[in-house]
């Protein structure tokens, strides 16, 4: 008989406003993490033992995820085959209600697959609404973008963003008091660009001069709040408060005490968009093997 224990890679999204972040927190806290709710929902599937999710990418309080990932081991009672991927998603989403957390899909992976360690890259998108203050922002955009009063000089932003590309010491974009100060500040930024975007249901209402922009960043990993600091600095360039040359100088000076701390974008405009893996690692179980397990449920 096949083992009833299985490792799954789960794809999930969440509206991060009401959570302390994605990582679990002590249950005595008034505000919990997304992981707390995932594990409570999984325990309702009546597994053998305690469920533990291993999150691919950490997000802070107020930050959202279009798609985050985690791996989880689920063992069922003796004689019961592992959940099919479809049933796992359906059951988890049922038990997650009414939380704004949803499983998108699940994939059976090999027992040595690790959602965080095996990730090749992570992509974040930061949404900016230029042309209005936050009180003037359409209600549907509430905690989903950063509203700034004036327009942006996109040409200057593009010039500055190119300086961030490649491998650099990003000490200037980390907190001087960071708990992770022991981690290497050397990061390789594979993508840093800005593109026009649209708001929610914008074709149904007059947006005056409101313009939405997506700031997109991709790297294997980032420093704590690095994306929000890069976004804040680039917006400052677009507003004329910083120059592209100053961005280059900050990188070269490698000083975490520089005044970039005054240009940290708020959390509510940030989304984890995607996590990339080697596709061959996501094929731990063949279609034939999966069919064998599925047949036990019929």
Curated annotation (Swiss-Prot):
One of its GO terms (molecular function) is RNA binding. The active site is at residue 60. One of its GO terms (biological process) is tRNA pseudouridine synthesis. Its EC number is 5.4.99.-. InterPro entries: PsdUridine_synth_cat_dom_sf, PsdUridine_synth_TruA, PsdUridine_synth_TruA_a/b_dom, PsdUridine_synth_TruA_C, TruA/RsuA/RluB/E/F_N. Keywords: Isomerase, tRNA processing. Substrate binds at residue 124. Transmembrane segments: none annotated. Pfam families: PseudoU_synth_1. The keyword Magnesium does not apply. It catalyses: a uridine in tRNA = a pseudouridine in tRNA. CDD domains: PseudoU_synth_EcTruA. PANTHER family: PSEUDOURIDYLATE SYNTHASE, TRNA PSEUDOURIDINE SYNTHASE-LIKE 1. Belongs to the tRNA pseudouridine synthase TruA family. This is tRNA pseudouridine synthase-like 1.
